[in-house]
Amino acid sequence: MTALILLLAYLLGSIPFGLLVGKIGYGIDIREHGSGNLGGTNTFRVLGAKAGTIVIVGDMLKGTLAASLPMLFSVPVHPLLAGAIAVVGHMYPVFAKFRGGKAVATSGGVMLFYSPLFFLSLIAVFLVVLAVSRYVSLSSMAAALYAVVYTVFFTDDIPLTVAVLLLASFIFYRHRANIQRILNKTEPKVKWPGKRS
């Protein structure tokens, strides 16, 4: 049963909401537009706020639902393990030729299930950095770095610390190209309403 739960978590994570929303709602393959990424940020840029929001919420719910599977089926699997497996599915989805997202929203969904207050603090860090920098990628990495610092130095929850270290490493690894573009000052910025650049 443990293996079945982990397989189900991976399959949940593999649901490519960006691909589904693009093809069903707009008749396009989101992987062929913008950055080519299946995540919510690229969907926002290519298809707009409505589609982007749907994808982000869907990607988050994958993590939340996957983390809840052990409880729902009364299986002795740690929710953070099931959630981490879903994040792997999100990054390397079997339903989308293993070309997936950058682990941010699904990781957030895992944290939402495990510790809602911690999740809210992550959102706060993300929004503050986004307001200052206008870089979604930098804001995501800043939230991941905050999560690492907080769990390593300010909590005794070992499973959470291990999970955060793993998920943060996923996030930084998947943002390698973004880091280079930030350094080169070619990374796209969020355009606030009323702002020209």
UniProtKB/Swiss-Prot annotation:
Pathway, per record: Lipid metabolism; phospholipid metabolism
Top class in the EC scheme: transferase
Subunit relationships: Probably interacts with PlsX.
Cellular localisation: Cell membrane
Protein name: Glycerol-3-phosphate acyltransferase
Organism, as annotated: Geobacillus kaustophilus (strain HTA426)
Top-level division of the source organism's lineage: Bacteria
Keywords for this protein: Cell membrane, Lipid biosynthesis, Lipid metabolism, Membrane, Phospholipid biosynthesis, Phospholipid metabolism, Transferase, Transmembrane, Transmembrane helix
A GO BP annotation: phospholipid biosynthetic process
PANTHER family found in the cross-reference section: GLYCEROL-3-PHOSPHATE ACYLTRANSFERASE-RELATED (PTHR30309:SF0), INNER MEMBRANE PROTEIN YGIH (PTHR30309)
Catalytic activity: an acyl phosphate + sn-glycerol 3-phosphate = a 1-acyl-sn-glycero-3-phosphate + phosphate
Pfam families named in the record: G3P_acyltransf
